[in-house]
């Protein structure tokens, strides 16, 4: 019997796959557990429509990420911090502070987990910070750390 898997089934198939399985296995296990549905023409059409919808959403997310990348690369975020001799900061600038400053100064809300700081910023001056907006899109944000008077 041909079935469409609704969820990943170890050793049998992944979500969205169409495979031939034994009738008893399909009727007694896959259908009852909600892991698969029968591969009828109507169900195949619904699966195709769902795949197209997911592709459109993925393309839309990618386009939004590219647009946000263009915006971010034009911006500079200024963060005042207390510093000692030689431009060394007391403490450090974290991704959370960068995200909050970006929101306050430019009105762009960005999740702090998307800001990829290798190490926290510990010195005054300009730093280029990578921001992963999408698995395929990474922007570079300029962060200017100034001395707080």
UniProtKB/Swiss-Prot annotation:
Gene3D superfamilies: Ribosomal protein L9, C-terminal domain, Ribosomal protein L9, N-terminal domain. One of its GO terms (molecular function) is rRNA binding. InterPro entries: Ribosomal_bL9, Ribosomal_bL9/RNase_H1_N, Ribosomal_bL9_bac/chp, Ribosomal_bL9_C, Ribosomal_bL9_C_sf, Ribosomal_bL9_N, Ribosomal_bL9_N_sf. One of its GO terms (cellular component) is ribonucleoprotein complex. GO terms for biological process: translation. Keywords: Ribonucleoprotein, Ribosomal protein, RNA-binding, rRNA-binding. Belongs to the bacterial ribosomal protein bL9 family. Binds to the 23S rRNA. This is Large ribosomal subunit protein bL9.
């Amino acid at each position: 019997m041909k079935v469409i898997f609704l969820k990943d089934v170890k050793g049998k198939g992944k979500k969205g796959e169409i495979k031939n399985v034994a009738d008893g296995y399909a009727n007694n296990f896959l259908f009852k557990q909600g892991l698969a549905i029968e591969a009828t023409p109507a169900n195949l059409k619904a699966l195709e429509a769902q795949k197209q919808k997911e592709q459109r959403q993925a393309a839309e997310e990618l386009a939004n990420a590219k647009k946000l990348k263009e915006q971010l690369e034009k911006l500079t975020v200024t963060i005042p911090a207390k510093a000692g001799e030689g431009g060394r900061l007391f403490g450090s600038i974290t991704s959370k502070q960068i995200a909050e400053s970006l929101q306050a100064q430019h009105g762009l809300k960005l999740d702090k987990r998307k800001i990829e700081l290798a190490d926290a910023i510990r010195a005054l001056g300009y730093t280029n910070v990578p921001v992963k907006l999408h698995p395929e899109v990474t922007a570079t944000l300029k962060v200017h750390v100034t001395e707080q008077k």
